[in-house]
Amino acid sequence: RYDTQMIVQATRSVARSTVARMVANGARNTHEWTTEKDDMLKAFDAAGITAAFMEPEQGGFIEGPKNLALALIGFELAWVDGGAATTSLASDLALAPIHERGTEEQKQYYMTRCVPPGVDGVQWRGAFALTEPLPYVGVDTGVLSGKISIVEWEEGKEPILQVEKRGRFITNMDFADFVTAAVDSGDERIKGSCMIIIEEGDEGQFDRGAVTHKLVHQLSSTRDPIFSLKVPASRIVGGYDVVDGVIVPRHSHGQIIEAVFRRTRVPVALMSSAKLLS
């Protein structure tokens, strides 16, 4: 396919020029997100790497399944630096819950804003927050302590939710404008778990958290964020129904994660292979 060939060539060019120069100049010597690392994102945008995940009607250019293209993007970047590949895949992962299970309104709103040059000249970037801190363990994707509860629900109006979430090893947090976060119910008026979208401008605390010190992947941004925010219930990924006065998300966080990871296994596997081979 011509579109796949072109994105592979463009990615290879970025990897062996922009990313290779960063590695040679010692960009991996710091865990902090720097101006030089930020320029890598702009190179991704210019090469079409950022838009490769989107549908054509959202500003993308690859029709149909994109697993092969995304896997090859990860492979080309990881051949030079695993952190660069992680940054690219994490941006896709932030949008994946919306792409797989989001409402049409959510897809249109967030996907179009992440395609360069964004909306009204402002481009958004996202992060995916699943893992949480566990004392003496690190993380466990099977444990979910983030909570949502209802703080305001006036008759005839949309409920306002309080989101409490602490993240661990969350990629892209230095520059994320929004986060898709996994949370569980902390209120008897909300049934089960879900994924919810939080934005930097929401009321409350959007703390990007402490920088994570890593042995590898220093060209990616990793932090341990803390969120305590009020958001409208329409941010629940996939929407919700009200049954007997209870908010019932249409998709649990487990269902969304299963749908997302089913599509990301191939890109991650190929990226890992490139890191080992290089």
Regions found by a protein language model. Give the residues of each.
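Generic recognition of stable, solvent-exposed alpha-helical segments in well-folded globular domains
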Residues: Y2, M6-A10, V14, T35-D39, ...
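Short acidic, glycine/serine/threonine-rich loops at helix termini
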Residues: H99, V137-V143, M173-A176, D207-G209, ...
